[in-house]
């Protein structure tokens, strides 16, 4: 079993987002202003005492530790801003994917040799079963992963194959691909795609 990792940079996502982003305005560790949807502050000026603040933006009504397919993506970001007397200061927060993405694929050669297969991917926060020919990506909090492949060959013999994925980082897409070489040995390849999935919050 081989594990290959490469990093593929991708361009920054732009445009309008349907993601609901909440926003906290924090001073000295205390939230002094909260909105469930940052767009409610568009065009609004905030009058604040001078000082240093933290503007924190994050996915509303979601759990950063959730595991699963659609709807589980969690975005977060923060920036410091210094408020000065008689100075109007715009603020921009870049919200990035706070989890990793995982997808599972199989080569045509693999599919020809096995009539049934599935892959369970899990970490300390939960697990996702990638059933046969599942094409969606799942979201996981960034922590070491274990991928367990269960398969049945054309002779009706069943096998399992486990592999650990370490040094897992947020904002990366881990694409797991299973293959069978001409010599009959299995290959386990991982391509790491440094997907940004950025949302820009400007107030």
What residues fall within each predicted segment?
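Extracytoplasmic cysteine-anchoring/structural motifs
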Residues: 1-26, 33, 40, 45-50, ...
């Amino acid at each position: 079993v081989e594990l290959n990792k490469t990093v593929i940079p991708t361009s920054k996502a732009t445009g309008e987002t349907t993601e609901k982003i909440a926003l906290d305005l924090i001073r000295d560790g205390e939230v002094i202003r909260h909105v469930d949807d940052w767009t409610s502050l568009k065009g609004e000026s905030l009058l604040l005492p001078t000082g240093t603040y933290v503007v924190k933006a994050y996915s509303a009504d979601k759990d950063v530790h959730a595991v699963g397919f659609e709807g589980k993506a969690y975005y977060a970001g923060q920036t410091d801003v210094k408020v000065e007397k008689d100075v109007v200061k715009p603020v921009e927060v870049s919200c990035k994917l706070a989890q990793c993405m995982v997808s599972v694929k199989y080569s045509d050669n693999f599919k020809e040799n096995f009539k049934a297969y599935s892959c369970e991917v899990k970490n300390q926060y939960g697990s996702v079963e990638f059933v046969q020919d599942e094409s969606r990506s799942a979201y996981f909090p960034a922590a070491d992963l274990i991928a367990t492949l269960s398969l049945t060959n054309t002779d009706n013999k069943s096998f399992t194959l486990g592999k650990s994925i370490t040094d897992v980082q947020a904002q990366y897409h881990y694409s797991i691909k299973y293959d069978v070489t001409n010599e009959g040995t299995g290959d386990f390849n991982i391509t790491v795609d440094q997907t940004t999935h950025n949302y820009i919050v400007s107030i």
